[in-house]
C-alpha cells in the first residue's frame, strides 16, 4: 500500500499574502501587484495550495488507500479513500477549501465512516500531489471526475454518492452537482454565494486594498463562476447549509443568501459562536448526527436499514 509520505513534503510552500504589506512605502507596489493580478488567472487570488502532510491517517487509526485517477482534462488527481466501518450505505466525496491540501481534512472521515459511509477526500489540481493548477472551472471538473470515480467503485448495496463541500469547496460542490446528476445530496458548510462578493469582502479588510475593492472584483472574477447562479438547478436533490455565526473569514450572511437562492428541499443550520469551519468543534455530536441523518434520509434509508 502506498503511504502518503511518498506524496507529501515535510513543509508547505508559503502562500501569497497581499494584506500584510508592512509600510506605506510599499503601498504603490502593493497596488501594482493587485493590478498585475488583474491580467492573470484566478489562481493567485483564490488558491493557496501546498504539499505538507498535516494529518497522518495512520495516527488516527484510519485504514486508507491512496488513489489516482484523471480529471476531465486528463491531469492526474490524487485522493485518499477511506472504507466505512461495516457495510457502506454510500460514498461521501469531500471538496475542501482554498488552502493547504487534502490531508488537513482527514478527521472528518472518522465520524462519516462510523455512520456507514465510504469517504473520498481528493485534491484539486495543483494541491497536494495532484497535477496541474487550480481554477474555478478546473476545480469543478476535478469534483465531477471524483464523483464519477466514487460512483464506479460503490460498495455492493450502497445507495449512491453524496457531496460535502466546505468553504470554497461549497462553490465547487454546487458546480459539480449541477453537472453530475448522479449526486444524491449535498452538505455545504462555510461557503459563499458569489466569487465577486467574497473577493470584495476580503479586499475591504485591508486599508491598502479597500480603495479598489469595488473596482477589481468585476475585472478579476466572472459571474459565471458564482454558485448562486446555478444552485437552484440542484433541486429536487436535498441541500443542507451549515455556517457558524462567528465566522470572520466568510460571513454567515453569504450562506444565508446562497440558501435563499436554492429550491426545496433544503435546510439551513446556523451554529451560534462557531468560527470558520469550526462548526464540528462547537456542535460536536449534534453536528455528526445531523449530517449522517441528512445523508441517510437523502439516500432513502430509515433507522431500520
Residue ranges and their predicted role:
Residues 283-305:
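Catalytic active-site module of serine/aspartate enzymes centered on a nucleophile-bearing elbow/loop
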Residues 259-277:
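Catalytic histidine neighborhood in serine/cysteine hydrolases
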Residues 72-149:
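Membrane-embedded segments
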Residues 35-70:
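An N-terminal hydrophobic leader/cap segment in hydrolases
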Residues 248-254:
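Conserved alpha/beta-hydrolase "acid-adjacent" motif
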Residues 175-235:
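Hydrolase active-site cap/lid region
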Residues 155-167:
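Alpha/beta-hydrolase fold nucleophile elbow
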Residues 234-235, 240-243, 247:
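Short beta-strand/loop motif that positions the catalytic acidic residue
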Amino acid at each position: 500500500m502506498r503511504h502518503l509520505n511518498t506524496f507529501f513534503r515535510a513543509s508547505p510552500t508559503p502562500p501569497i499574502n497581499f494584506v500584510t504589506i508592512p509600510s506605506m512605502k510599499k503601498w504603490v507596489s502593493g497596488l501594482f501587484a493587485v493590478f498585475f493580478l488583474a491580467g492573470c488567472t484566478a489562481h493567485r487570488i483564490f488558491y493557496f495550495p501546498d504539499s505538507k502532510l498535516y494529518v497522518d491517517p495512520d495516527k488516527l487509526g484510519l485504514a486508507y488507500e491512496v488513489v489516482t485517477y484523471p480529471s476531465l482534462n486528463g491531469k492526474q488527481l490524487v485522493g485518499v479513500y477511506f472504507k466505512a466501518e461495516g457495510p457502506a450505505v454510500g460514498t461521501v466525496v469531500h471538496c475542501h477549501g482554498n488552502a493547504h491540501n487534502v490531508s488537513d481534512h482527514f478527521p472528518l472521515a472518522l465520524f462519516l465512516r462510523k455512520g456507514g459511509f465510504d469517504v473520498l477526500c481528493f485534491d484539486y489540481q495543483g494541491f497536494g500531489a495532484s497535477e496541474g493548477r487550480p481554477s474555478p472551472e478546473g476545480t469543478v471538473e476535478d469534483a465531477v471526475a471524483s464523483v464519477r470515480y466514487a460512483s464506479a467503485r460503490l460498495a455492493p448495496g450502497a445507495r449512491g454518492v453524496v457531496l460535502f463541500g466546505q468553504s470554497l469547496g461549497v462553490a465547487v460542490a454546487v458546480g459539480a452537482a449541477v453537472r453530475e446528476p448522479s449526486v444524491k445530496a449535498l452538505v455545504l458548510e462555510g461557503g459563499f454565494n458569489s466569487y465577486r462578493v467574497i473577493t470584495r469582502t476580503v479586499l475591504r479588510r485591508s486599508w491598502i486594498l479597500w480603495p479598489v475593492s469595488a473596482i477589481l472584483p468585476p475585472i478579476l472574477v466572472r459571474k459565471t463562476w458564482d454558485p448562486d447562479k446555478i444552485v437552484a438547478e440542484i433541486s429536487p436533490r436535498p441541500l443542507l447549509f451549515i455556517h457558524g455565526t462567528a465566522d470572520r473569514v466568510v460571513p454567515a450572511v453569504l450562506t444565508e443568501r446562497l440558501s435563499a437562492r436554492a429550491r426545496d428541499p433544503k435546510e439551513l443550520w446556523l451554529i451560534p459562536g462557531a468560527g470558520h469551519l469550526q462548526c464540528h468543534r462547537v456542535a460536536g455530536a449534534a453536528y455528526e448526527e445531523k449530517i449522517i441523518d441528512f445523508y441517510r434520509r437523502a439516500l432513502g434509508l430509515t433507522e431500520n436499514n
